[in-house]
Amino acid sequence: MEIHSVGPFIIGKTLGQGTTGKVKLGFHKDTGFKVGIKIINKELLINKPSMRRKIEREIVLMKLIDHPNAMKMYEVYETSKYLFLILEYVEGGELFDYLVEKGGLESGEALFFFQQIIIGLEYCHSRNICHRDLKPENLLLSGDKRIKIADFGMGSIVRKDMLLHTSCGSPHYASPEVVSGIDYDGQKADVWSCGVILYALLTGKLPFDDENIRRLLNKVKNGAFSMPPYIHKDAQDLLTKMLTVDPSKRISIKEIKEHPWFVSNFNQFQKATPVEEINAEPLVDYSQIDEDIFRSLMALGVGTIDEVKQQLVSNQKSATLIYYRLLEERKKFDSDVNKYGYKPKETRRNSLSDMSLKKIFSGSNNNNNNNNNNNNNNNNNNNNNNNNNNNNNNNNNININNNNNNNNNNNNNNNNNNNNNNNNNNNNNNNNSAVGKSNDSSSQQPPHIQQPHSQQIPSNSTSQESMQISPSNSANNMAIQQPIINNNNNNNNNNNNINNNINNNINNNINNNSNNVNRPTSEGLLKQALQQHHQQQQQQFNGNNNNNTMNVQPLTMSASSSSSSSSTTPSLSPNSSTTSSTSTSPQLSAIKPDHYQRRGSMTASTNPATSPTMSHRGKTSSPIEITSKVRKLKISESQSNTPNSPIIGSSPKKSWFSYFFSKNSSSNNLNAANGSAPSSPSLQSNGVGQLQTTQANYVIESKIDVNLIYVNLEKIIKKYGFELKYQQQQQQQNIKHCIVRSHHINSDGTPQFECEIEIKPSTFINPVSPSKQHHHHHHQQQQPQQQQMPPLNLNGGQNINHDQGFRVSIIHKSGSQHKFNNFTSSLEQILTI
């Protein structure tokens, strides 16, 4: 089945697409609250454990963050195939696009953005969270130009005085110590990245840039860049201190906030409270531990199972306990529906049920509530007679259904030019359509959705009195609104309609309530939902909207060609194919300036959304290997579903911590005895390439030569100061086992760190580009042993290549989870190049 909604959200147009999946616009069914819905295919996470760990960590980190300058994540839904991350919708686009359009910014505007970046980053650092991938592509702009730090996939929890090992991020923004492959301070590395961003804000260029990756890394290591003379001297001083090669001499966040240029606009900033200063009460015993929160802590790598459990019940203050309490508060917040635009104690009027959604997609009309409408009119008449001296005339009541046979003779239902006593309202029931407005409660909007200002034609006008035009429209170009699509009104809605009509008569003015007759429907919530699901029809509408004939088709919404309203009214005709956008973003120039191109990847021309992370070290990786990796990602992206293709799967279920992660991340099991490594269930990828390592904590698929695997394995082990011992090889299956352990011994005689590694041949699937289909078929003829594999049709007909390689399975025996995570991450980087 196609998935059109996730929880209370209707899925709309595609906003973007990256390596992990698409991001679509979502609307809350009841309030119209906009969100971004990140859709991740779980098959990608099964085939690439590092990607799974990245998403897992990103989810938990975003649950710990609540700041105006950081993107929020509201909740998580999932099906058997997909993860749905409900994110804050940031309508202004990337800071990168803004810089491409504007070029170098004025000092004041650059400072305005830079201050927000530093304040948001200071908050993250106060939570001991390092971003490690700061760049303009990961900084989003809200409608009022507020910075939102996004993409915490490379983020990490860093304890005091702890150094990080993994080289990650984008090379143009990475610090010298990161690209050099040495241990580094994550917070100092973030400061360097902010320095590069500040340089880009002021100049529209990057301080370190080169098409050749090796020359680029050398420039970063040397820290040599040109300082334009037009930059303010104080800003030059701050840039020099931020782009200092020696991290011990590099300026800190606290010192940045005290710098003369930073405080030159006299803004006062509140200091972020360090996580160590937050009060947290310990748990009474293990039985109080929430399993979802516990798995989240394990995903952060804060310790082993026993260590985390002990810290949660200990009276000694620890960051782990504070994180637990913060996540506990976040879990309570997740159950609060008011975050989606509800007002306390407010009746939810405009819910789109599953049945009404089906009618939206089928385009059927529904006028089944005639009796209720008749009762409404009768009640309105009684109330109006009691509260108004209108000569027993209730022409203020609006009948929008020609099937409503009201017994009250005071209502003139079939007169298109019927004036009421207040000259504000009229009745129009011709062909069950309203001209210029509608009182259908299925099109109501919540109070927080603002309506565009419109001009009301006076009652003595020669044109139809019910017509509304925007300020830019002429009298000859009338806005024709959509007919009523859904009249399934509940009793609460009817009562609200009654009260609103009473208030209209008493006050003798136009009420701005969502039920008011003068409210235009073109911006209604139902229209917004339709607009997202019928984007392809806009082209036909644009070709026909020059016609001034007011011809209302049963399921067509038209608009004046001269209207300059900020919202466009879509057509529901099923023949058009152009995407319609309801959000505005900075208009990009047709040709990007040469001095500032996307640098999110190893090659300047690569889209940062599909860019790999910097999984190389400057002295070991060649540009050819990196370029081939980028190309492989591009091939995988190009064969995915089209941006507006439907999502197929079962109905999404709400999940505070993804069941996928709790199922496949063996180290997250709260019930594991004595902190030992519990066994993981076997993983499958559509029946092909099964991972039979039922006890492995981590699995790496590698295509490089087995001898090179051994060489790289020994390099990593030597770097960490571990010892490697090979066990007897199983000749028949060509499987090799080895033990990795640290030289340091605990008091009980066990090594401080130990893991077991198994290396064996493997066959796993890989997408094949259309241009290589013939070559792949010929390759299968030369190697008949591969023809035994049955033909596959995965991912909508995508061709699959069965690559031969090696599976490296790692079992965590003892030692800290954090050290194990670092070790496996380093090993995967060097084995998957």
From Swiss-Prot:
Polar residues: compositionally biased ranges: 460-472, 600-625
Residues bound to ATP: L15, G16, Q17, G18, T19, T20, G21, K22, V23, K38
Residue ranges with Basic and acidic residues bias: 338-351
Molecular function, one GO term: ATP binding
Keywords: ATP-binding, Kinase, Nucleotide-binding, Serine/threonine-protein kinase, Transferase
Domain spans labelled Protein kinase: 9-262
GO biological process per UniProt: G2/M transition of mitotic cell cycle; sorocarp development
Active site per UniProt: D133
Catalytic reaction annotation: L-seryl-[protein] + ATP = O-phospho-L-seryl-[protein] + ADP + H(+); L-threonyl-[protein] + ATP = O-phospho-L-threonyl-[protein] + ADP + H(+)
UniProt xrefs under CDD domains: STKc_BRSK1_2 (cd14081)
Domain UBA residue range list: 288-329
SUPFAM superfamilies from the UniProt entry: Protein kinase-like (PK-like)
Biased composition range(s): Low complexity: 365-432, 441-459, 528-589
Region feature Disordered, mapped onto this chain: 338-472, 528-626, 764-799
Coiled coil: none
Catalytic activity, EC: 2.7.11.1
Homology family: Belongs to the protein kinase superfamily. CAMK Ser/Thr protein kinase family.
Protein name (database record): Probable serine/threonine-protein kinase DDB_G0277165
Organism: Dictyostelium discoideum
